[in-house]
Amino acid sequence: MTRPTLADLVAAQERLAGIARVTPVLSSGTIAGFVGRAVLLKAENLQLTGSFKIRGAYNTIAQLTDSERQAGVVTASAGNHGQAVAWAARQAGIAATIFVPEGAPMTKVDAARGYGATVTLGGEGFDEAVAAARLHVETTGATFVHAFDDPRVIAGQGTMGLELAEQLPPGPGTVVIPVGGGGLASGIAIGLRALRPELSLVGVQAAACAPFAGRAPVGPTIADGIAVKYPAELTSAILRDLLDEVVVVDDEAISQALVLLLERSKLVVEGAGAAPVAALLQGLVPGSDPVCAVLAGGNIDATTLVSVTRFGLTSSGRYLVVAIMIPDRPGQLARIVDAVAAQRANVLSVTHHREGRNIGVLETEAELTLETRDEEHSQALIAALAAEGFAVRRLT
């Protein structure tokens, strides 16, 4: 398979003109304050269909022959790529079939259907969905649009690199790119190495699935958009040649970055989109030159957003859950609440447990969920409760 060239990226940019948005690069004073350098955010979460995937999908579909267009397109995806293929196929007036694994997020399934695609369950996992899509190709002659292992897809994603070459300030700097299958990072790297060779390029992967960092997959991650176990030979070769480094962040760091972007930058991003910011906050991208984090997508459903936000607040010490054993008589809970109020913390919920192996007949265990400013505030609150004579057991 031939590696895309700068000319391929320029041709893709011409095809995407008036189709894909030229997403903005935003300055973040808040994140800059944390990392001690100028921070820019490539807000691709504001792209059509909510992610960069529309670039590669449309560039591929726009190059189909008449006979290929008549047979339609097919892909396997549980998320952003499926939506992008569905949208691009609708724009081209051709049929699209998306095979999804069981348990795929319903918001993303519904979005693909809303763009006019036929969505079909393709088995328990992603591999089964791919197998079903390949079988569909054999029986119908449809064109399989791969999420990353296709030069046309890589060239389309690379149009973001052409935009960054113009949008970033002159001189040295660093671009941090989420890496899953490697299509986005490969495309950006091809463009920036040709046009802005002075820039450093850093890839970031989720700790649970980081093959480019030499780690075996160990389980699910909130950054499902970059949870690719087996990258392609083409993208692997490109990234080995063109990336300066690949760093790894865990779900705790990703969730904290997601919350920060939501609260301070007013940007809704998915886990994969928050990974570059997580790498910055964790100090994994040292330097003093300006740094740009690519926010690759913003497709996160409300239920997941609530869960990830709560996880991020808890991991940063802003949600504190404690259990306190108290005598089962009036006024004891009020003492706890008064101590919490004196520390300027907020009580979110209280649960009483009167049954349990370690709970005496005349005792009750009060479990409190508290809102605090940060980890330091949480520790000060626990110390204040202990000073009031309470035996505090921290649960988060």
Regions flagged by a language model, labelled:
Residues M1-T396:
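PLP-dependent amino-acid enzyme catalytic core
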